[in-house]
């Protein structure tokens, strides 16, 4: 009888692990909102790059090791750009277009899609170019060839997600929601950079 009781206790403790992790995340989010969002954004951005590299390796049947510098670039971008900037942009959007304003959901979506999306994409290309140590001519060439297709893909993929995010996801979870979706978005952007 003791082994069964012991097994049940272990199983119940394992079930509480996600609850404890969530409680810890919520506490950190409350105490250090920008830092928590920055760290989670950095980690999820690096995971998105890892996903892109893994997909690319399988498509090319490549046996090379993963490019650690790519993971680090995405980590830095998420940690210092996406996480903190997203935190403040969602706050700005929440307070500049409060939910009770007529057509708030449409106004927020238009603000996000027509202003924030192109700005973030431009910033992405610029920061990645800097982190890769490339010159301005490479940046300009990449903008000419990749910006418009990437923005069109952004509008297709992110518009429904951002409508849900900015209108239905609680403010403190919007960066995390976007970061989870961005796993696949960064995989797409990383594939453009190759």
Swiss-Prot record:
Residues in the signal sequence = none
**Source species, domain of life:** Eukaryota
List the stretches on the Peroxisomal face of the membrane.
52-74, 135-172
Q: What does the UniProt keyword field contain?
A: Membrane, Peroxisome, Transmembrane, Transmembrane helix
Which Pfam families does the entry link to?
Mpv17_PMP22
GO cellular component terms, semicolon-separated: mitochondrion; peroxisomal membrane
Asked if Transmembrane is a keyword of the record, the answer is yes
Tell me the InterPro entries matching this sequence: Mpv17_PMP22 (IPR007248)
Give the bilayer topology. Multi-pass membrane protein
Subcellular locations according to the entry = Peroxisome membrane
The keyword Cytoplasm is annotated on this UniProt entry: no
Q: Which residues lie on this side of the membrane: Cytoplasmic?
A: 1-30, 96-113
Q: Where are the transmembrane segments?
A: 31-51, 75-95, 114-134, 173-193
Question: What the protein does?
Answer: Seems to be involved in pore-forming activity and may contribute to the unspecific permeability of the peroxisomal membrane.
Sorted alphabetically, which PANTHER family does this protein's record hold?
Answer: PEROXISOMAL MEMBRANE PROTEIN 2 (PTHR11266:SF80), PEROXISOMAL MEMBRANE PROTEIN 2, PXMP2 MPV17 (PTHR11266)
Describe the family membership recorded for this protein in Swiss-Prot or TrEMBL: Belongs to the peroxisomal membrane protein PXMP2/4 family.
Name the chain's protein. Peroxisomal membrane protein 2
Taxonomic source organism: Mus musculus
Classification lineage: Eukaryota, Metazoa, Chordata, Craniata, Vertebrata
């Amino acid at each position: 009888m003791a082994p069964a009781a012991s097994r049940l206790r272990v199983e119940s403790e394992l079930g509480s692990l996600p609850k404890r992790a969530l409680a810890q995340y919520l506490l950190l989010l409350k105490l250090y909102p920008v830092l928590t969002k920055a760290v989670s954004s950095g980690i999820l951005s690096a995971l998105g790059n890892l996903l892109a590299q893994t997909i690319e390796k399988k498509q090319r049947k490549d046996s090379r090791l993963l490019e650690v510098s790519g993971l680090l670039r995405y980590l830095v971008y998420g940690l210092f750009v996406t996480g903190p900037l997203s935190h403040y942009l969602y706050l700005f959007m929440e307070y500049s277009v409060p939910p009770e304003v007529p057509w708030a959901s449409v106004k927020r979506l238009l603000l996000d899609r027509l202003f924030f999306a192109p700005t973030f994409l431009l910033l992405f290309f610029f920061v990645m170019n800097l982190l890769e140590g490339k010159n301005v001519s490479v940046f300009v060439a990449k903008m000419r060839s990749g910006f418009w297709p990437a923005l069109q893909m952004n509008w297709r993929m992110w518009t429904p997600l951002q409508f849900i995010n900015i209108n239905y996801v609680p403010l403190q979870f919007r960066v995390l929601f976007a970061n989870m979706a961005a796993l696949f978005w960064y995989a797409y952007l990383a594939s453009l950079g190759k």
